[in-house]
């Protein structure tokens, strides 16, 4: 397979971790980074990470880019994606990780700039025009002739969808309520401050457990249409830096037991969802999953059963590292299918 040339727009938490996840992959070459922050600061943030540790590669800053193990990656600082030099840099795919260009119109500016495809590392605001693809769930629906812009949804949807798929495929999921207990993120302030849309979200991240809204559960229907109208959810933002956990309470169509649900999860984790869905029956806590590349890790010891049709299951996820690895996996899956279609 010819190397996939990738550009990154927005070198924040996800942008940097996508690069970390893919930098040693022989099938990927990063050809450009766009961010308003100067290259020397970007290099520093890439090299030293308070959550995931120091990058083991050699990192050096230049006036116009970053050098990683001798490989130079140009850095530019352009506000309008349509003016980016993706064509000149030879970018096949662009990871749109600013959080700003999540609809078709915004993401298509990268195509105007010469990119061939765009992967939005966030939920799309334009689900009717931008297909949502999750590795292990519906990535096989990628159509090279149509899907020039795709969304990888959110880290929480990536965690919930494999769990919901296993439940629905084996027992039928009739309705469910999800809660994600989510690590704090960059959008939250360190101390109390104003927040236009969400007053509670403006409270100090390190001081509070903050109830919040999330579209992650409803978004599962974008990749599993049979679950449309059957799932919704909410979030609690908690003062931990990384690793989150999904709690799904649900009814099944088929009478079953928690033991059978665990068996189905274990089978999927070793078979069709290997590498995507993990499984543990050990006495684990959140930090045990820091650096885990799975989208979702089913915790057999944490779930409960009320009766033969009503259950609660729990699944962990490294909301930064697991998600960033899925972005890389999705790009590789897409380019492989694209190259096969071209033969």
UniProtKB/Swiss-Prot annotation:
Keywords, ordered alphabetically: Cytoplasm, Glycolysis, NAD, Nucleotide-binding, Oxidoreductase
Protein name per its UniProtKB record: Glyceraldehyde-3-phosphate dehydrogenase 1
InterPro entries per record: GlycerAld/Erythrose_P_DH (IPR020831), GlycerAld_3-P_DH_AS (IPR020830), GlycerAld_3-P_DH_cat (IPR020829), GlycerAld_3-P_DH_NAD(P)-bd (IPR020828), Glyceraldehyde-3-P_DH_1 (IPR006424), NAD(P)-bd_dom_sf (IPR036291)
Purpose of the protein: Catalyzes the oxidative phosphorylation of glyceraldehyde 3-phosphate (G3P) to 1,3-bisphosphoglycerate (BPG) using the cofactor NAD. The first reaction step involves the formation of a hemiacetal intermediate between G3P and a cysteine residue, and this hemiacetal intermediate is then oxidized to a thioester, with concomitant reduction of NAD to NADH. The reduced NADH is then exchanged with the second NAD, and the thioester is attacked by a nucleophilic inorganic phosphate to produce BPG.
Annotated PROSITE patterns: GAPDH
Gene3D superfamilies named in the record: Dihydrodipicolinate Reductase, domain 2, NAD(P)-binding Rossmann-like Domain
Similarity field: Belongs to the glyceraldehyde-3-phosphate dehydrogenase family.
Main location: cytoplasm
Entry EC number(s): 1.2.1.12
GO cellular component, one term: cytoplasm
Gene: gap1
Compartment(s) of residence: Cytoplasm
Catalytic activity: D-glyceraldehyde 3-phosphate + phosphate + NAD(+) = (2R)-3-phospho-glyceroyl phosphate + NADH + H(+)
Keyword Oxidoreductase: yes
Domain of life according to the entry: Bacteria
Keyword NAD: yes
List of residues binding D-glyceraldehyde 3-phosphate: 154-156, 185, 214-215, 237
Pfam families per the UniProt record, alphabetical: Gp_dh_C, Gp_dh_N
NCBIfam families: GAPDH-I (TIGR01534)
Pathway terms, separated by semicolons: Carbohydrate degradation; glycolysis; pyruvate from D-glyceraldehyde 3-phosphate: step 1/5
Subunit structure: Homotetramer.
Binding site for NAD(+): 13-14, 35, 79, 121, 319
Site (Activates thiol group during catalysis): 182
């Amino acid at each position: 397979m010819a190397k996939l040339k990738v550009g990154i727009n927005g070198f924040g938490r996800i942008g940097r971790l996508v690069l970390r996840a893919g930098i040693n992959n022989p099938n990927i070459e990063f050809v450009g980074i766009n961010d308003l922050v100067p290259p020397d600061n970007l290099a520093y943030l890439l090299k030293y990470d308070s959550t995931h540790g120091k990058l083991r590669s050699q990192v050096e800053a230049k006036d116009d880019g970053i050098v990683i193990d001798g490989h130079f990656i140009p850095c530019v600082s352009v506000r309008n994606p349509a003016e980016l030099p993706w064509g000149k840099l030879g970018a096949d795919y662009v990871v749109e990780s600013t959080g700003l260009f999540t609809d078709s119109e915004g993401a298509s500016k990268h195509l105007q700039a010469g990119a061939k495809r765009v992967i939005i590392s966030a939920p799309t605001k334009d689900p009717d025009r931008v297909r949502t693809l999750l590795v292990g769930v519906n990535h096989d629906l990628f159509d090279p002739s149509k899907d020039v812009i795709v969304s990888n949804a959110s880290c929480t949807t990536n965690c919930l969808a494999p769990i919901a798929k296993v439940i629905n495929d084996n027992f039928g999921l009739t309705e469910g309520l999800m809660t994600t207990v989510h690590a704090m993120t960059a959008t939250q302030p360190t101390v109390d401050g104003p927040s236009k849309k969400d007053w509670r979200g403006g409270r100090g991240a390190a001081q509070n457990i903050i109830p919040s809204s999330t579209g992650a559960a409803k978004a599962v229907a974008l990749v599993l249409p049979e679950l449309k109208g059957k799932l919704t959810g909410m979030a609690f933002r908690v003062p931990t830096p990384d690793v989150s956990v999904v709690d799904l309470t649900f009814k099944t169509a088929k009478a079953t037991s928690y033991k059978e649900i665990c068996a189905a999860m274990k089978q999927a984790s070793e078979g069709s969802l290997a590498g995507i869905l993990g499984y543990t029956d050990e006495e684990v806590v959140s930090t045990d999953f820091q650096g885990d590349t799975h989208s979702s890790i089913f915790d057999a010891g944490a779930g409960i059963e009320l009766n033969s049709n009503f259950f609660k299951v729990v699944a962990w996820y490294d909301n930064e590292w697991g998600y960033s690895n899925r972005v890389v996996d999705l790009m590789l899956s897409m380019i492989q299918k694209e190259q096969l279609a071209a033969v």
